[in-house]
């Protein structure tokens, strides 16, 4: 029994219940398994029907608003942690000089405003990538930003890097409470607007955002997003020469933390090699996130008037080919964050087997529910115990 202390908050009391001691070591797995199962059942049978009958743009706004309120309710974050945390030393990783509680994280794109950090930390995520954040305010594309493709376990995305600006978003995310060791990365990119000189203007915006995250002690790492297929005024950083120009400018900085680069998705993974060669030549780059949204609609039933690119299961094959290509051609030069089409626990484990050091997801959050992270971790523990 946890003694009541008038100086303890409700969150503190529940956190005390989750610490390892002789009285609760055997009880914790039972609580966690029951909590994960209950959350999964509740999501699939009660929440998901509402999710799939709500306009996706509106649903995203409601989710952010819910998380902002939920983290302020006494005891709720502690209860979330109690139900979902799956603890094991076998999950922990030391990568890029950082200690990850587990190798699974949230990709950039869902938490554009930095409002989900406390909830994700409480739910046991290993890391979160906030953003993408732009150097200056970026309105993004005209609505709608999202369309669901349930038959294909996918989502059409046409947001176009909306951002309040890196200074505002970074301050919000880095000041959020993180009591359970989740690491925080900041994704940086260019504002979605036309410049007098498009390449120079975009690079300048990258640098503004980079400088904010680089100097913010609340962030553990930086992800440079060179894959922005929904920008209205072109995507120059699918060209290796332009990537080199951008990286040369960033290399002039005094870089204070690990740097990843989020790469574009190609149906033929070999098209990545010129970009990877450029990245490999810049010593400050620690790793790559492969890969972003799929552009090619071949074989997919998508209305012609739906703008955007594809997230979810249809990205799986080409992005996993990219993971294998990076590991085969560059050995241990890059830390690999595998993203794209990671829906089930088996998908997450397969990416690790193919050479990824870290695995991120977004679309599974909608199709599987918020307990997905606990399911991934539990699957990894079970496999390593065999």
Label the model's feature ranges.
Residues 108-111, 187-191, 263-269, 335-346:
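Glycine-rich beta-to-alpha transition loops that act as phosphate-gripper elements at the mouths
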Residues 115-120, 267-280, 342-359:
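Catalytic cores of alpha/beta
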Residues 140-153, 298-312, 364-386:
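C-terminal helical cap(s) of enzyme catalytic domains, especially alpha/beta-barrels
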Residues 129-136, 287-294, 342, 348-375:
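Glycine-rich phosphate-binding active-site loops on the catalytic face of alpha/beta enzymes
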Residues 192-207, 235-237, 263-281:
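Active-site glycine- and acidic-residue-rich loops that bind
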Residues 98-105, 180-185, 254-264, 329-338:
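Short beta-strand/loop segments at the ligand-binding rim of alpha/beta enzyme cores
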Residues 131-182:
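A gly/proline- and charged-residue-enriched helix-loop-helix capping module
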Residues 77-87, 226-238, 273-332:
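Glycine/Thr-rich beta-alpha phosphate-binding loop at enzyme active sites
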């Amino acid at each position: 029994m946890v003694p009541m202390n008038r100086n303890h908050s409700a969150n503190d009391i529940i956190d005390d219940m989750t610490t390892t001691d002789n009285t609760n070591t055997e009880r914790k797995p039972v609580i966690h398994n029951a909590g994960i199962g209950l959350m999964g059942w509740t999501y699939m049978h009660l929440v998901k029907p509402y999710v799939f009958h709500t306009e996706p743009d509106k649903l995203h706004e409601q989710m952010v608003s819910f998380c902002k309120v939920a983290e302020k309710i006494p005891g709720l974050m502690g209860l979330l942690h109690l139900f979902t945390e799956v603890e094991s030393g076998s999950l922990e990783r030391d990568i890029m000089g950082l200690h990850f509680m587990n190798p699974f994280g949230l990709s950039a794109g869902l938490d554009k405003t930095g409002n989900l950090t406390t909830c994700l930390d409480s739910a046991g995520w290993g890391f979160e990538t906030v953003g993408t954040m732009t150097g200056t305010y970026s309105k993004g594309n005209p609505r709608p930003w999202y369309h669901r493709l349930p038959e294909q376990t996918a989502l059409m995305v046409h947001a176009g890097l909306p951002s309040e600006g890196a200074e505002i978003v970074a301050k919000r995310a880095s000041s959020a409470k993180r009591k359970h060791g989740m690491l925080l990365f900041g994704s940086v990119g260019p504002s979605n607007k036309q410049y007098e000189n498009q390449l120079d203007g975009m690079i300048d915006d990258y640098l503004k955002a980079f400088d904010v995250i680089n100097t913010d002690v609340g962030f553990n790492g930086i992800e440079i997003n060179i894959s922005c297929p929904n920008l209205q005024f072109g995507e120059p950083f699918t060209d290796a020469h332009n990537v080199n120009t951008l990286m040369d400018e960033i290399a002039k900085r005094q870089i204070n933390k690990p740097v990843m680069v989020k790469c574009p998705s190609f149906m033929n993974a070999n098209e990545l090699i010129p970009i990877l060669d450029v990245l490999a030549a810049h010593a400050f780059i620690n790793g790559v996130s492969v890969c972003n949204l799929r552009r090619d609609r071949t074989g997919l039933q998508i209305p012609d008037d739906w703008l955007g690119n594809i997230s979810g299961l249809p990205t799986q094959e080409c992005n996993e080919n990219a993971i294998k290509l990076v590991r085969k051609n560059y050995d241990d030069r890059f830390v690999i964050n595998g993203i794209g089409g990671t829906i089930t626990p088996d998908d997450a484990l397969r990416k690790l087997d193919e050479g990824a050091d870290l695995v991120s997801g977004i679309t599974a959050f909608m199709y599987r529910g918020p307990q997905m992270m606990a399911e991934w971790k539990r699957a990894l523990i079970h496999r390593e115990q065999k």
